[in-house]
């Protein structure tokens, strides 16, 4: 989805904050660029059960497959694993008085959500992801 003013470096998408603001909705910008969190149970994909591939709303990077999605009851779309491990980055997050693992898009560094070690098999992980960070490409 890069436009003429978008730079890519080693598969990274680099845009100015002005470009991001123009291209993303206000909630997408807040989540992806400012690390905001949607209110629980408010996101577009929380109860969406269509088959497909979830890509980054900022850059189109493939992130999760619908067959890895499960209902965790936490209020955000949850997945057991990324579609491609190298398409997500994880960083330690000590904001808000908590210690968590933040999940970011490896291509555009957009904030996606957090991963927790309380999910079902096969991984035991729960990738708790903001709907605003995702775009579903139905199969």
From Swiss-Prot:
InterPro entries: Met_Sox_Rdtase_MsrB (IPR028427), Met_Sox_Rdtase_MsrB_dom (IPR002579), Mss4-like_sf (IPR011057)
Signal sequence region: none
Keyword Metal-binding among record annotations: yes
Catalytic activities: L-methionyl-[protein] + [thioredoxin]-disulfide + H2O = L-methionyl-(R)-S-oxide-[protein] + [thioredoxin]-dithiol
PANTHER family reported in the protein's UniProt record: METHIONINE SULFOXIDE REDUCTASE, METHIONINE-R-SULFOXIDE REDUCTASE B1
UniProt xrefs under Gene3D superfamilies: Peptide methionine sulfoxide reductase
Enzyme class: oxidoreductase
Molecular-function annotations in GO: peptide-methionine (R)-S-oxide reductase activity; zinc ion binding
One GO term describing the cellular component: cytoplasm
Source species, domain of life: Bacteria
One Gene Ontology biological process: response to oxidative stress
Cofactor: binding comment: Binds 1 zinc ion per subunit. The zinc ion is important for the structural integrity of the protein.
Family: Belongs to the MsrB Met sulfoxide reductase family.
Source organism of the structure: Bradyrhizobium diazoefficiens (strain JCM 10833 / BCRC 13528 / IAM 13628 / NBRC 14792 / USDA 110)
The protein, known as: Peptide methionine sulfoxide reductase MsrB
Active-site feature positions: 128
Cofactor(s) listed: Zn(2+)
EC numbers for this chain: 1.8.4.12
